[in-house]
């Protein structure tokens, strides 16, 4: 079978890095590339609509005003899954521009398909490692906010180093946020919620909007996700955190 653009995309979600003596440098990644296959429909949606809804990793900052055709705030969501809640938020907030990052191509294809169905134009998606996008493709101060909903909890203690929410990640995000930019996280793992709260609270550039100094109720503007519904079924709680850059 001929390899299409969508098929090739899965193989280029991160840039290979090497040591000075030419050996491949292993990275501690917050994601694992699952083997889920693109459906024919998802493949076609990616191939047909990438030019209008997709962005590729680049080593210089995106020109968001040119990409979106306006200067509306940019809200970045990392790990949007199948993309339904992201598209719903973009549809409900035409005064904001949304940028979604997801490394799993079936999710990217599904997100694009739903965006086309809803007629959403204020959304772009990227299929690449988020840490590289933050490092290379987004200018300092360019973002209005970051959304991180139900990231992989890596629940085993020996895997906690793989969790995306680490001090260096938060520092990197803050650098990309403009003044009063927000960080909104949600998880259905209490241990991860505690880690998120600890890491975010330790950064003096952020202010917690919770009146109690911890978590907030799910705001109406965040759609109920399938991961959240799954958590409720398993008897898990759900914790939202909302911090603002000083």
From Swiss-Prot:
InterPro entries: SAM-dependent_MTases_sf, tRNA_(Gua-N-7)_MeTrfase_Trmb, tRNA_methyltr_TrmB_bact. It is an enzyme of class 2 (transferase). Signal peptide: none annotated. One of its GO terms (molecular function) is tRNA (guanine(46)-N7)-methyltransferase activity. Keywords: Methyltransferase, S-adenosyl-L-methionine, Transferase, tRNA processing. It catalyses: guanosine(46) in tRNA + S-adenosyl-L-methionine = N(7)-methylguanosine(46) in tRNA + S-adenosyl-L-homocysteine. The active site is at residue 152. Substrate binds at residues 156, 188, 225-228. Pathway: tRNA modification; N(7)-methylguanine-tRNA biosynthesis. Its EC number is 2.1.1.33. S-adenosyl-L-methionine binds at residues 77, 102, 129, 152. Gene3D superfamilies: Vaccinia Virus protein VP39. One of its GO terms (cellular component) is tRNA methyltransferase complex. SUPFAM superfamilies: S-adenosyl-L-methionine-dependent methyltransferases (SSF53335). Catalyzes the formation of N(7)-methylguanine at position 46 (m7G46) in tRNA. Belongs to the class I-like SAM-binding methyltransferase superfamily. TrmB family. HAMAP family: tRNA_methyltr_TrmB. This is tRNA (guanine-N(7)-)-methyltransferase. The lineage of its organism: Bacteria, Pseudomonadati, Pseudomonadota, Gammaproteobacteria, Pasteurellales.
